[in-house]
A protein has these predicted regions:
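The conserved cystathionine-beta-synthase
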Residues: 15-34, 39-42, 84-102, 108-111, ...
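Short, charge-rich, low-complexity interaction segments located
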Residues: 63-71
Length: 133
C-alpha cells in the first residue's frame, strides 16, 4: 500500500506557517492539543519541519523575556530533533523504522508539498494486520 492511501489528509491536520510568531504557534497548538506540529511554507505549502512544544519552551526560557519571545518568528526557534518526512509514493511497509521513532511522518509529494501525515498508530495497525495474513 502506498503511503498516500493511509495518510490523514492535510485539511484534517493542523499546521503552522513559517511566518507565524511564537505566540501564534502556542495559540494554535493549545487549540488543537498537538505536542508537535508541521510547519509549512506559506503560499507553496511545502513542508519545512515540525516544531514541538518543547522547542518552543526552550526558546522562551533561553530568551529570558516572555513578551519578546512571543513576538519572535517560529523560524528563529532551534529544534531539538529532526522529524523525517516521506514521499507519498513510498510503500507503508518501508516506514516501520521511521514510525517507531516518531509520533507521525509528514507526507510530501516529489516537490516537497505537504500531503498529510501518517500516524504511528496507522502505520503499526497496517503492518500488524499484514503480519496476520
Amino acid at each position: 500500500m502506498k503511503a498516500k492511501e493511509l495518510a490523514t489528509q492535510p485539511r484534517r491536520v493542523s499546521n503552522l506557517f513559517n511566518d507565524f510568531t511564537v505566540g501564534d504557534a502556542i495559540a494554535k497548538m493549545s487549540k488543537c492539543h498537538y505536542q508537535m506540529i508541521p510547519v509549512l511554507e506559506r503560499n507553496s505549502n511545502r513542508y519545512l519541519y515540525s516544531l514541538s512544544n518543547g522547542d518552543i519552551l526552550r526558546h522562551i526560557i533561553s530568551m529570558g523575556d516572555l513578551d519578546k519571545a512571543l513576538k519572535d518568528s517560529i523560524s528563529s526557534i532551534s529544534m531539538e530533533r529532526l522529524v523525517l518526512s516521506c514521499n507519498e509514493e513510498m510503500e507503508v511497509d518501508d516506514l516501520f523504522d521511521i514510525a517507531i521513532n516518531q509520533n507521525y511522518i509528514p507526507l510530501v509529494d516529489k516537490s516537497g508539498v505537504f500531503k498529510g501525515i501518517l500516524t504511528r498508530r496507522s502505520v503499526m495497525t497496517y503492518l500488524n494486520q499484514g503480519s496476520k495474513e
